[in-house]
Amino acid sequence: MNTPYSIEHLLNPALRNIATYKVEGGQQAEIKLNQNESPFDVPQWLKEEIIGEFIREPWNRYPDILPYRAMEAYANFVGVPAECVIMSNGSNEMLYTIFLACLGPGRKVLIPNPSFSLYEKLALLLQSDIVEVPMKSDLSFDVEAIMKAAHNEAVDVIVLSNPNNPTSTSMSYDAVRKIAESTQALVLVDEAYIEFSRERSMVDTIEELPNVVVLRTMSKALALAGIRIGFALANAPLMAEISKPKIPFASSRLAEITLMKVLANYRLVDEAVSAILSERDALYEQLRMMEGVSPFASDTNFLIVRVADANATFKRLYDKGILVRNVSGYHLMEGCLRCNVGLPEENRRLAEAFAELSVEVKG
């Protein structure tokens, strides 16, 4: 009998500390509210316009090393020089790129806890030291604790998901700026949900503050999760360095054309965001009146809802065809579910399901 071949010696030892990414409950449901996507698809007429232009492109040729036309369009859209912008295959690609550029064995990254799980995964893969700073009990950022830990631990990178996933809370513009001005560390501000926020973006600081990098995604407000488009923004000298590990040719011509067409029709995004915010606030008001159901005020396109038994409630919702995200395993989020805002009918069904739970709590 042959001895089983062990592959362990072939692998980076850091993989022992990393789990494969999974979406609990899968990605298919009658009412899908678990991945913070926009409930509004790109309209058919705009899809046809995009595909019509893409068909005329040569498919046998590589795209540009970087999608320069789309980068210039986005730079003009946000009001910064084109050399301060880089486009990626989703913002996660630039997250990988920036971590590769700035972290490694013996280097330190500060991450508020809880926050987006990919930050920790990448830091572990790169064998960097993680400095965790707990959020406050109301799931708000502890700004003073962040600055103190950054100084005492001499961290190399500070990562701020702002607004924060999974808590749905934000740090003020002034607070983010205060952190950036108080440290020599790179301050990476992940603004995946900024279009839904009451707070100002940090984009207008990138040429003034030499250590600030802003991440943006087109997967949420712009409804392009299936196309995979993200951006990083930083001052030109910093951008030139942190983009060195980036994979060339990572953005397709389809992504470039799509981005430019959506920006040219941005009123569609504005209308969708307005509708989502209206639904978010209405859903929050409904849920907070229910006994045994405690929603947190949100600055994103999702609500965090605390219940007595998150696991049981997740299953009951799933059995009703409603898929949400169980985030009860995160620090400070015991009993919590994450529900992104859907279409009006989907939100009505979700509220009805929570209302049934509330009636049972009353007994």
Swiss-Prot record:
Q: Pfam family example for this protein?
A: Aminotran_1_2
Which pathway is this protein assigned to?
Answer: Amino-acid biosynthesis; L-histidine biosynthesis; L-histidine from 5-phospho-alpha-D-ribose 1-diphosphate: step 7/9
Known catalytic reactions: L-histidinol phosphate + 2-oxoglutarate = 3-(imidazol-4-yl)-2-oxopropyl phosphate + L-glutamate
* Gene3D superfamilies given in the database record: Aspartate Aminotransferase, domain 1, Type I PLP-dependent aspartate aminotransferase-like (Major domain)
Give the disulfide map.
none
Q: Which cofactor does it need?
A: pyridoxal 5'-phosphate
Task: From the UniProt record, give one GO term of the biological process aspect.
Answer: L-histidine biosynthetic process
Q: What class of enzyme is it?
A: transferase
- Which Enzyme Commission numbers does its entry carry? 2.6.1.9
Q: Which UniProt keywords apply?
A: Amino-acid biosynthesis, Aminotransferase, Histidine biosynthesis, Pyridoxal phosphate, Transferase
Q: So which domain of life are we looking at?
A: Bacteria
GO MF terms here are: histidinol-phosphate transaminase activity; pyridoxal phosphate binding
As stated in the Swiss-Prot or TrEMBL entry, residues carrying the post-translational modification N6-(pyridoxal phosphate)lysine are K220
InterPro entries the UniProt entry points to? Aminotrans_II_pyridoxalP_BS (IPR001917), Aminotransferase_I/II_large (IPR004839), HisP_aminotrans (IPR005861), PyrdxlP-dep_Trfase (IPR015424), PyrdxlP-dep_Trfase_major (IPR015421), PyrdxlP-dep_Trfase_small (IPR015422)
* Family in the record: Belongs to the class-II pyridoxal-phosphate-dependent aminotransferase family. Histidinol-phosphate aminotransferase subfamily.
The UniProt subunit note reads as follows: Homodimer.
| Stated name of the protein | Histidinol-phosphate aminotransferase
Q: Which organism is it from?
A: Chlorobium chlorochromatii (strain CaD3)
